[in-house]
């Protein structure tokens, strides 16, 4: 329904049939597939045994909307006037990156390593989506890839074998022709080919916009989740090829369904869950993915899990929730 959109041009989960019918939390296509395979086995058409519940791959993805809290002169002035004062602001501004409350990347990688040690290194990947463009107010903060701090973050990614994807700007979401330019800029700064993408604000607006991802050389897109409801937007927990609705062509572009974005769970305008409810709902989705032998894509922003100060963060338990989910995956 092209006429039903929020202020960012997104079709929301609460408007979808799966949500209204009460099965957004189920990978319904995977369930149908399992049922059909069972019938085929009963009819002796297919002899393959159904696999036991098992998550094929875990993608720990992190959108780097705001990599640092207080690393520019503007930030320093802001925190001196409105924050905790000059002394504390100066420590964040002038000290090592580890003193910045938004620099939570080492902790995130530590969680990945814990999970990899149990389930295997090939079944778990860390993926940081980094912006390289955008001038909209919704693209703030506008950070520079060539800055000393960003270069240090990119070096950290290289050292820790973290994959880097393009976090397409809000502007590029509205004008998809900009995607190629942003991708090329990120590639120049990283020195590597970039083939993964996620749209800022999860703002994948129209189906035909996927053509621009193809043209830019994107092979895998991780945008396919609703911002307002965690669950299965595509009805499946498995990666699927995009099908161009205009010519019915099966595209080489692969869409990875996003199961859980942390702010979908807690934001008052979205699901508005408390910690216990968020953990229970997330655990339910994880079990559904395992039952379907799918892949689990999680999205936690680096600035949502800060422990020292909570600027613009609605709740203080997202770090605790992420750690609990990692433990749940280790157990299962």
Residue spans of the language-model regions?
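Catalytic domains of cell-wall/extracellular-matrix polysaccharide-remodeling enzymes
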Residues: 171-250, 256, 298, 307-310
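Short C-terminal domain-edge/linker segments immediately following a structured domain
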Residues: 89-94, 158-162, 197, 227-230, ...
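Glycine-centered flexibility motif
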Residues: 22, 165, 229-233, 294
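Structured helix-beta-strand junction loops
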Residues: 159-160, 216, 292, 332
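Metal-dependent polysaccharide deacetylase catalytic core of the NodB/CE4 family, i.e.
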Residues: 66-70, 106, 110-204, 302
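Conserved hydrophobic/aromatic pocket- or pore-lining residues that grip, position, or stack substrates
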Residues: 63, 167, 213
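Terminal accessory/targeting
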Residues: 1-145, 238, 245-332
């Amino acid at each position: 329904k092209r006429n039903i959109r929020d202020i960012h041009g997104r079709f929301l989960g609460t408007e979808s049939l799966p949500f209204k019918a009460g099965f957004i939390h189920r990978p319904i296509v995977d369930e149908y597939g399992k049922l059909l395979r069972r019938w085929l086995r009963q009819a002796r058409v297919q002899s393959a045994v159904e696999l036991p519940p098992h998550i094929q791959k875990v993608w720990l993805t992190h959108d780097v909307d705001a990599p640092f809290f207080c690393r520019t002169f503007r930030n320093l002035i802001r925190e001196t006037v409105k924050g905790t004062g000059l002394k504390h602001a100066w420590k964040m501004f002038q000290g090592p990156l580890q003193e910045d409350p938004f620099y939570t990347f080492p902790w995130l990688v530590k969680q990945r390593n814990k999970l990899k040690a149990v389930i295997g290194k090939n079944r778990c990947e860390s993926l940081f989506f980094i912006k390289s463009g955008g001038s909209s107010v919704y693209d703030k903060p506008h950070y520079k890839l060539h800055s000393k701090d960003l270069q240090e973050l990119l070096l950290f990614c290289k050292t820790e074998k973290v994959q880097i994807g393009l976090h397409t700007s809000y502007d590029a979401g509205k004008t998809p022709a900009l995607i190629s330019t942003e991708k090329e800029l990120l590639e120049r700064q990283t020195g590597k080919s970039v083939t993964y993408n996620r749209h800022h604000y999860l703002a994948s607006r129209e189906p035909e916009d996927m053509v621009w991802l193809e043209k830019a050389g994107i092979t895998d897109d991780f945008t396919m989740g609703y911002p307002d409801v965690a669950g299965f937007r595509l009805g499946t927990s498995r990666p699927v090829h995009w099908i161009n609705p205009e010519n019915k062509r099966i595209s080489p572009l692969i869409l990875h369904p996003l199961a859980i974005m942390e702010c979908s769970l807690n934001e008052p305008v979205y699901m508005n869950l408390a910690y216990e409810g968020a953990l229970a709902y997330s655990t339910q989705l994880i079990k559904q993915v395992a039952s379907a032998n799918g892949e689990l894509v999680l999205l936690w922003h680096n600035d949502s899990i800060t422990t020292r100060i909570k600027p613009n963060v609605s709740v203080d338990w997202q770090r605790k929730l992420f750690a609990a989910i990692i433990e749940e995956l280790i157990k299962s």
